[in-house]
Swiss-Prot record:
UniProt function note: Involved in mRNA export coupled transcription activation by association with both the AMEX and the SAGA complexes. The SAGA complex is a multiprotein complex that activates transcription by remodeling chromatin and mediating histone acetylation and deubiquitination. Within the SAGA complex, participates in a subcomplex that specifically deubiquitinates histone H2B. The SAGA complex is recruited to specific gene promoters by activators, where it is required for transcription. Required for nuclear receptor-mediated transactivation.
Entry GO CC: cytoplasm; DUBm complex; nuclear periphery; nuclear pore; nucleoplasm; SAGA complex; transcription export complex 2
InterPro entries the UniProt entry points to: TF_ENY2 (IPR018783), TF_EnY2_sf (IPR038212)
Gene of this entry: e(y)2
UniProt similarity note: Belongs to the ENY2 family.
Compartments where found: Nucleus, Nucleoplasm; Cytoplasm
Assembly: Component of the nuclear pore complex (NPC)-associated AMEX complex (anchoring and mRNA export complex), composed of at least e(y)2 and xmas-2. Component of the SAGA transcription coactivator-HAT complexes, at least composed of Ada2b, e(y)2, Pcaf/Gcn5, Taf10 and Nipped-A/Trrap. Within the SAGA complex, e(y)2, Sgf11, and not/nonstop form an additional subcomplex of SAGA called the DUB module (deubiquitination module). Component of the THO complex, composed of at least e(y)2, HPR1, THO2, THOC5, THOC6 and THOC7. Interacts with e(y)1. Interacts with su(Hw) (via zinc fingers).
Keyword annotations: Activator, Chromatin regulator, Cytoplasm, mRNA transport, Nucleus, Protein transport, Transcription, Transcription regulation, Translocation, Transport
The keyword Ribonucleoprotein appears for this protein: no
Species of provenance: Drosophila sechellia (Fruit fly)
GO MF, one annotated term: TFIID-class transcription factor complex binding
PANTHER family per record: ENHANCER OF YELLOW 2 TRANSCRIPTION FACTOR
GO biological process: heterochromatin boundary formation; mRNA export from nucleus; poly(A)+ mRNA export from nucleus; positive regulation of transcription by RNA polymerase II; protein transport; transcription elongation by RNA polymerase II
Pfam family, one: EnY2
Name of the molecule in the record: Enhancer of yellow 2 transcription factor
Length: 101
């Protein structure tokens, strides 16, 4: 099992995944990222969606790279710190001797 899949599985089992997701959503809303991305989508749809041939998949493909670059560094750092904390907890739990009672 790879490290990323182990972390993914651990975060799902402990409920940390939803906490990380909630933290991300709240931080992106607080910094105005969601509004920026929504406006970007609206502008793209106005520009390219007049003939109804522009699909959701095309919109996602066009917006995703731009939206990722708009995520503030502070939000990225905060999430990385949270994930590192989780990794540290996993490592500490793995290092603890198991009770054989």
């Amino acid at each position: 099992m790879s490290i990323s899949s182990a972390v993914d599985q651990y975060t799902v089992l402990t409920g940390d995944r939803s906490k990380i997701k909630d933290l991300l959503c709240s931080r992106l809303t607080e910094c105005g990222w969601r509004d920026e991305v929504r406006l970007m989508c609206r502008n793209i749809l106005i520009e390219k969606g007049t003939n109804n041939s522009f699909t959701v998949e095309q919109l996602i493909a066009e917006v995703t790279p731009k939206a990722r670059t708009l995520v503030p560094d502070a939000v990225k750092k905060e999430l990385l710190m949270k994930i590192r904390t989780i990794l540290t907890e996993i490592e500490e739990e793995a290092d603890e001797p198991e009770d054989e009672s």
